[in-house]
Amino acid sequence: MNSFTQQIKVSRQQSEIQSFYEPALRVLGHLFEVKKQNLRNKGYDENNAAITREEFSQTMAQRFRINQWLAGQIVNSLANADLVQKFGGYVKPKVGVHE
């Protein structure tokens, strides 16, 4: 019975995290456009635009009124679901996933 309740808890946690996918991708898209515009204004290649995981997590925590831990879990879950590119301490939207 203990493992059953643990499975339910994990399932609920996954559902909670996945419910943030769409709003998180919107936030990421907005941050990405701002970064691209900044690079464009400075004359650099906008293909180099990326958002730090920390900035993305903090923005989600502020906008969605969630804690940093949950925001980090959302970032990791998005990467595991192959909805964002995660490299080093940076993330960026996958091409064609959310436009």
Question: Where are the model-predicted features located?
Answer:
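Short acidic, hydrophobic short linear motifs in intrinsically disordered regions
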Residues: R40-T59
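Short amphipathic alpha-helical interaction segments
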Residues: R65-S77
